[in-house]
Each structure stands twice: as C-alpha cells, then as structure tokens.
C-alpha cells in the first residue's frame, strides 16, 4: 500500500529495497470546474484549458550547472538515460497521471545529487492563469518492476496566485535515495525563473 505524504515529509526510497532502480514519477492535476451544467460539460466546457508542464532539474551539489540537465517537453531525455519525460499533456483533463517521468536511479551520474520536480503553467501571464485554477494536484512514485505505487503526495495548499510549483525532490543520502514532499508555490512565470533559484 502506498504511503501518503504531507508537505515537508521525507522518506527513504531505496533503503531496504535491494535492486530498486526504475521508478515512474506521475504528476496529475485537474482544472477547477467553472460549473456550466450538463450541456456545458457535454460540449467540452467546464474548466479552463490550462497547459501545465512538468519538468525535472538535475542538480549537481544542489546547483543547476548545465542546460542539458533540464528534462521537459523540449528535451525529453537526459544524456545519461536516467531521466525520461514521456511527453506533454496539454489540458490536464481526465483521471490519473497527466504527465509521467521515468527514472532509472542506476543511470543517474554520481555527480548528480538531486532531482527537482516542478510544474509550471505555459503562457500563464498572457492567459492570466495561476494554480488557483487547478485542483487535485499530486505527485506519486511507482516501482516500475512491479507497478506498485510506493508513495503519493497530494498538494493540498492554496496555490492561488502562484504560477509555478516545486512539488518534490528525489535526492541522494549517502548510498541511498530519498524523497522529499516540497509543495512550494512560487510566482515564477517561466521555467528559466525557476532554474535561476538553483544557479
């Protein structure tokens, strides 16, 4: 059974789990319904069309040092093959994961000590959109070897006015890997702004 995490909690991912290397990190969200009744939903109305994008920053000693260490819809796979984005979901509609990132911890180079998972809203300024228009946001980790959900973190804070979310981190702790539920909303409007926090 998956462990449910709260903001600020940390958990061992690999300790006591010999051979665990391949993970699937799923991120999901839903647009807040604007109502509109049955016919609105039937005709495709309801919530606003919000294009959230999940990305991973691969950090070296806590710093972002190479633009190729940004894995997102424009660069789907890391050079090492340890981080792979499966592609962009443009609407966030439907149940389950909206975007998925495949991780192979054994392939992540030794100089990379942290993977930061962020979500931002594409073109948020022009579209006047923020995370107050999103509900049911979560990040979860699945063991790819048996498809078992290991943990899930539901982002329950009020993120109204926030345009980016630093959802979680997977980081080295000695010879093991840990997961941290971060859940920090920011006013960064572009991926470059988020990256600048780690330069």
UniProtKB/Swiss-Prot annotation:
The lineage of its organism: Bacteria, Bacillati, Bacillota, Bacilli, Bacillales. The keyword DNA damage does not apply. It comes from the Bacteria. Belongs to the CAPAB/TerDEXZ family. This is Stress response protein SCP2. It is found in: Cytoplasm. Keywords: Cytoplasm, Stress response. Pfam families: TerD. The keyword ATP-binding does not apply. It comes from Bacillus subtilis (strain 168). InterPro entries: Stress/Tellurium_Resist, TerD. Induction: In response to low temperature and salt stress. Its main location: cytoplasm. PANTHER family: CAMP-BINDING PROTEIN 1-RELATED, STRESS RESPONSE PROTEIN SCP2. One of its GO terms (cellular component) is cytoplasm.
